Amino acid sequence: MMGAAFAKRDPRIAIIGTGGRGTSLLGNLLVAKAQVVALCDIVAEKAQGAGAMVVKAGQKQPDLFTNGPHDFERMLKLSDIDLVIVATPWLWHAPMAIFAMKEGKDVAVEVPGVTTIQECWDIVETSEHTGKHCMILENCCYGYNETLILRMIHAGLFGELLYGEGAYLHDLREELFSNAGEGLWRRTEHTRRDGNLYPSHGLGPVANYMGIQRGDTFSHLVSMSTPQRGLDIYRKAHLKAGDPRNAEKYITGDMNTSLIKTSKGLTITVKHTVSTPHPYDRINQIAGTKGIFYDYPARIYLDGQNKDESFEGIDKWKDHEHPLWKTEGEIAKQNGGHGGMDYIMLYRLLQCVREGLPPDMDVYDTAAWSSIAPLSEMSVSRGSAPVQFPDFTRGQWSSRPISAIATQA
């Protein structure tokens, strides 16, 4: 599957998971005039509501599969489905993606793509054996700032890259203790794992900036976590006596910091916190020999461009705006989805399939970006010892071409 393109077609899409995230993706797909032919969820009412969205968009009623947690298998045996969107709790991502590929379907899977190193290898080997794609739906790679900075990097404005930093800093305490949506399953992850549980929102754009697995590769990481305090404090303040959640023991440190070294010597910091008071922030920093960019708020400093030692905004660099944002930006903003990046991501996925192009992020990226979570857990458990990255490309990272998202419309 190295460098392979999608089979050119107008895809017939099935979505597994029609909760909050699945229906958000569905809405954007319908605006992009995607064919949605089947929907699956363990809650029949959610699948029915998603089906009504499809009909309202002028398409025929999609087939619904709501007969338990394994009914997706029955759905994926249908011959008229050729692209599957997986938007379910994390532990289901790998088995659903693998089953879909074995049934001859390309897959686009929500983040984190998979959760263990074995699953990373499983999706790579299944993709190679079946000839089907497994793309990570990392929407943050399609943000306006991220795509603009990526094109500036490829124009040489940052010089040789040296350092990047990404993060997922998001106060999810209320959501984690909700009796609906992600509160039904995501909090459980905090009882099982201590590391960076959700790395790719911050890491994905930085990996694209640096050409990771396309001329460079992750070598090793060290990771450390603070004590866990936030969920205990929130629970004490908000739950009543007798609530069964009071018996849960949380082990995920409130802030995890992981430091990655690449084979070329570049360094990357990746941070994660969802259990403390914090404004939303992905940091999105990249530094090179000619300048530096930080996000939240967006600010840039390029050698010879600033009159004093101070940052400036990025408006003057609008000529590097990505072609997708030039042509689809207004539609993207009107349809929401994290500032429009969700729409751009799905529009681009459809574009790649319809034009027979390779995916911007392939199964090797899905595996490498997802591997941060289990590797960070290993390092934390070993006293922050260095942990080596597997080479999911089996040595081919040095000759793979740069992802087309950097240049293509």
Question: What do the PLM-derived regions correspond to, one by one?
Answer:
Residues 24, 277-409:
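C-terminal helical cap and adjacent loop that interface with cofactors, partners, or active-site loops
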Residues 83, 89-90, 94-142, 156:
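Beta-strand-loop-alpha-helix segment that lines the small-molecule cofactor/substrate pocket
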Residues 258-264, 288:
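Active-site beta-strand termini and strand-to-loop segments that position acidic
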Residues 252, 270-280:
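Glycine-rich phosphate/pyrophosphate-binding beta-alpha loops
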Residues 1-57:
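N-terminal Rossmann-like dinucleotide-binding module
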Residues 62-86:
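A structured beta-alpha segment of the ubiquitous adenosine-cofactor-binding alpha/beta core
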Residues 17, 130-135, 140-249, 349:
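Predominantly a Rossmann-like dinucleotide-binding segment in NAD(P)-dependent oxidoreductases
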